Amino acid sequence: MELGWWPQLGLAFLQLLLISSLPREYTVINEACPGAEWNIMCRECCEYDQIKCECPGKKEVVGYTIPCCRNEENECDSCLIHPGCTIFENCKTCRNGSWGGTLDDFYVKGIYCAECRAGWYGGDCMRCGQVLRVPKGQILLESYPLNAHCEWTIHAKPGFIIQLRIVMLSLEFDYMCQYDYVEVRDGDSSDSQIIKRFCGNERPAPIRSTGSSLHILFHSDGSKNFDGFHAIFEEITACSSSPCFHDGTCLLDSTGSYKCACLAGYTGKHCENLLEERNCSDPGGPVNGYKKITGGPGLIHGHYAKIGTVLTFFCNSSYVLSGNEMRTCQQNGEWSGKQPICIKACREPKISDLVRRKVLPMQVQSRETPLHQLYSSAFSKQKLQDAPTKKPVLPFGDLPPGYQHLHTQLQYECISPFYRRLGSSRRTCLRTGKWSGRAPSCIPICGKTENVSAPKTQGTRWPWQAAIYRRAGGVHGGGLHKDAWFLVCSGALVNERTVVVAAHCVTDLGRVTVIKTADLKVVLGKFYRDDDRDEKSIQSLRISAIILHPNYDPILLDMDIAILKLLDKARMSTRVQPICLAAPRDLSTSFQESRITVAGWNVLADSRSPGYKDDMLRSGVVRVADSLLCEEQHEAQGIPVSVTDSMFCAGRDPTAPSDICTAETGGIAAVSFPGRASPEPRWHLVGLVSWSYDKTCSHSLSTAFTKVLPFKDWIERNMK
């Protein structure tokens, strides 16, 4: 007996030596001891040591805290010397979470996991299971340790059942599911009737309870572990039990009861009865057309169609479908819609926005024609009485938009009096499915103006006169604001998108470099020099392109002509209309004998002068001068020039009043004579002011013009 305590004392002494050899991290003085089990040999205080140790066999370093007590010599005695304490008792790991043991939470309270995997909870992340009373939710068990045991109980509201779907399953497989498994019972306890056990990784079909609760048990043995499982559940109603047969659809009403919507061929409360199968007879294709099966099961023996068959109808060329394009075989054995017919018709021809169309009453051909009467006169009265006299009946029906019946007539006219029509004024739908005549179009009436009394032309508003402006930012000097616009010359509007102008107006001086389109603009409908006077009537248009004549010589100003393409169409009105183009052969008299009217603004006018606001478009009459005399006049002024074949010189007509200084306007020259389209006089463009030397605007000096007549073909090619 006396020797029996020596082994115990020796073991305790060895433990103390072992503890003293371990590194001490820190010591915490706690005024309250953790519990009665630690009060043996404890005095008024209780301290803790944090210990690091290495688990046997795993070489895994873990930590924990142990309490210690002060002895009579004020030394801290580890409580490991007491019975029941072993150094590796708490050498644990967090199998279902992340390590997080701190101070006494690790050893005393057992909380050594900072965060648990989904489905696990507790300080050691080993607790699982729950009682659930929600309409829907999920059960997720992420991974699992050995020898785990978890239970869940799901409760639904009275009158509802529970549907459980296992969407992920990863457990140890066994044919009997006796190692790792999920067990579902129809009730609220482990004694309820078992529905089935599940293991492996094959997801089962949805599970439904017969009552308002389900019990789920998870169990794992001590050999293997996998990823766990994930299930979702929800409360369901009477329809969830699939009371409708043959793929019928269950529909709940407000009272909680249900009705079944049956598929084709079934009837009854639960869609349990089979209807007698019905078919639709083949409707055939329309005359001058055909049909195709475009949906459903199709025809039976080529004569009958099953329920749901869809037919689509088509017409031959020059015929149009009137009626239902598609028909479906219905439950009652009848086709939907009405049988369509194919009608001879014409597609409406496309017209521009400038053309107005009117549909005239159809003129149906009959036997009451002069030819028929002549033919009938050769026969007896008896034979004539036997001949049909009624007008033939045409297959009328509703046509889709954009089509017209046979013999329909369309009448065309221009929407504005400032346009004239080209093409046919009336077209008829022919039996060929085409329209008679030519497609109509409307073009602006050119060269027409009012209130011009020759030879006096002052104060006339020439509607084709175009003012060409240039932005001051592209010109050096002059004292103009950077964004200001100034008038550089005049041009002639020849159609809705084209203006003819002298080439030197839109190029840099002495060069063929074209000014940027953004630095130029065209103003139409202008009369006064001051823009504010014409504010309501003018149209300010942007330029999309500038086309110089390829042979333009900026030094001699030979072929000084260019075309401006407008970005937007000019709107025709009494103030804006184009001028006509003419070839030399169109002139009724010799060009040299023509009285030519020149119009333009004074581009050099000073806006600060008193009469600036009242200054208007000026015009006057000139006559063609001899080219040799023109050259000699300028040579006498010290300016040797050459008048080429693309130019003509002209001076003021002393017999006609004039308020224009031709050299200052950069204007246009026009002649009035009857045109080809109308015997009425029309104004035609014949010239553009090109160059001159005339500081005093005297009658003796001539101005050089670009002759427009030779460039008619080039202009028309670029007008398209």
Curated annotation (Swiss-Prot):
Q: Which residues are glycosylated?
A: 451
Q: Which UniProt keywords apply?
A: Disulfide bond, EGF-like domain, Glycoprotein, Repeat, Secreted, Serine protease homolog, Signal, Sushi
Q: List the disulfide bonds.
A: 128-150, 177-199, 239-250, 244-260, 262-271, 280-329, 315-342, 414-442, 489-505, 630-649, 661-697
Name of one Pfam family that matches: EGF
Please name the GO terms that the record assigns under molecular function.
calcium ion binding
The signal peptide here is 1-21
Entry-linked SUPFAM superfamilies: Complement control module/SCR domain, EGF/Laminin, Spermadhesin, CUB domain, Trypsin-like serine proteases
One cellular component term (GO) for this entry is: extracellular region
Domain named Sushi: residues: 278-344, 387-444
Main localization of the protein?
secreted
Which family does the similarity line name? Belongs to the peptidase S1 family.
User: Under which name does UniProt file this protein?
Assistant: Inactive serine protease PAMR1
**Species lineage:** Eukaryota, Metazoa, Chordata, Craniata, Vertebrata
